[in-house]
Amino acid sequence: EAGLPKHDSLSNMILQYGKYGKNHVYSHRKGKGMPSYDKLAENLQVGDLLVAKKRARHIMMFIGTLRDFGYTEEELPELAPYLDYALVIHCGPNFAYTDRIQAFLDAHQDDSYYKGVKTTDGGVAISIIGVPFGDAPNRGSYGVNDFAWFDMPDGYKLTIWDLPSATSFCWFRMNP
């Protein structure tokens, strides 16, 4: 809340459209449709929240675009058509964490501090919104989740968050 008046729960602000509709930038609701993915980020503000539902509700935060972070067509030829697509930060299942954390635990198996520590099935990740799954050069599954991703120059795996597969969604702005 950062010094602002206390606000309602995020769940209520998303679900109570009659009360909080002014905060809904775009959604699955009629009349609140989004622009095309290549124009979406132009109409968002860093900090806008994306709440989407597939099997359960998932909350993500808009952080900008690849171009905002200084990437170019030359640097990312596979992602060149998507440099202006929205990037979100979120936490949840992510295949990339399991092996990395297990490797760390294996390398420190003699350290009693890590005795009994199990690997995780996810963590904080950056994903891109709107890129068709089929356009990603890499695909995989972990548990019930399917992933498609691009390998970034620094080794990071930039996953696609597949918004078209959501049954409902809302881009939400705290202070419209």
Stretch-by-stretch model annotation:
Residues 81-85, 89-176:
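Low-complexity, Gly/Ser/Thr/Pro-rich intrinsically disordered linker/tail segments
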Residues 4-111:
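...with weaker cross-activation on analogous glycine-rich loops/strands in unrelated enzymes
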